[in-house]
From Swiss-Prot:
Protein family membership: Belongs to the CarA family.
Recorded name of the encoding gene: carA
CPSase: annotated segments: 1-184
Pfam families: CPSase_sm_chain, GATase
MF terms in GO: ATP binding; carbamoyl-phosphate synthase (glutamine-hydrolyzing) activity; glutaminase activity
Name this protein carries in UniProt: Carbamoyl phosphate synthase small chain
Subunit details: Composed of two chains; the small (or glutamine) chain promotes the hydrolysis of glutamine to ammonia, which is used by the large (or ammonia) chain to synthesize carbamoyl phosphate. Tetramer of heterodimers (alpha,beta)4.
EC number: 6.3.5.5
Amino acid sequence: MVSLYLENGLFLQVQSFGASGTQVGELVFNTSMSGYQEVISDPSYKGQFVIFSMPEIGVVGANSKDDESFFSSAGILVRHYNEFFSNSRADFSLSAYLKERGVLGICGVDTRSLIKTLRHHGCLMMVASTIEHDKNKLEEILKNAPRISHTPLVASVSTPKIITHQRATFDFKTLDYKPFDEKNSHKTIAVLDFGAKGNILNELQNVGLKALIYPHHTKANELIKAYEKKEIHGIFLSNGPGDPLSLQQEIGEIKQLIGAKIPMFGICLGHQLLSIAQGYPTYKLKFGHHGSNHPVKNLETNAVEITAQNHNYCVPEAIEKIATITHRNLFDNTIEGVHYKNAPIISVQHHPESSPGPKESHYIFKEFVKLLENFPTRE
């Protein structure tokens, strides 16, 4: 059994199918119909519980190859968990996977009702425990826990040292993995790691970019010197968890990088940090965008792209003063992509690498390559 207590006073006792323990986190919902392993292992979900709107979870099991990172969400909530899985690539059940990673698995939940609660109240903090079942004690645990906006999550999911991304990537044409070959790398970029997904790094690699992954607290001067020495040709700012406004030290360094006119590309949290660094702070959405079925309009082509999304914060409309808005969300008209006028920078709020999700926005990685080619390193 697992007991849940939400900050709105809701108390539930339901079934457990994952790890044991007590976890506190922010409750969000995800509308993806598949790809639960990639969601669970996405570093951006660090400190959060994820409700899956898809009622049946577990039917394809899990494996050792599709993880986005070594990090996980606090737990998942599902309507019905199916222990019997069928997939040629599966190595073990979802239950075994959750236990191995220390993730709470919660089933038998009226997920439709909970999602309606979040839509009405917004994201809520929650405590879940397989150990403590007293409502008053759980309420006390939640009361004393820090809010997610006050928790330094990025430091716990960033690389501690500079490493090179060299990973075999899955080829959807051959349905097999192709090894990394440095001969295919035409440019080298620095990745500021705020909690980068593995498949973002894979896509950078697939378009001919060698990715050097730097810690989140890397000083701007170090990157500027590397750019001037032609050791790197540009910078990528990754996705990651938490409130972007809590990263004040990183924002200060990014401001210097913008001033140095280095070509840059940001996704999700990276997109938000680029906005804040130029004086346009983000605001929090009521319940965020989480799922692989969000329509986005490309304002340059008028094409509608179905995208993967995972964020609770958004850049403001005022960003239009210094940037051209390139993409908009068709659910709520929020900004999904910009091209800055004052620097060689592009950024998007959604996830063009998908994983899970459709591949309709993959072209954005090639646009970054074009940006690097149009703004060569200094002589």
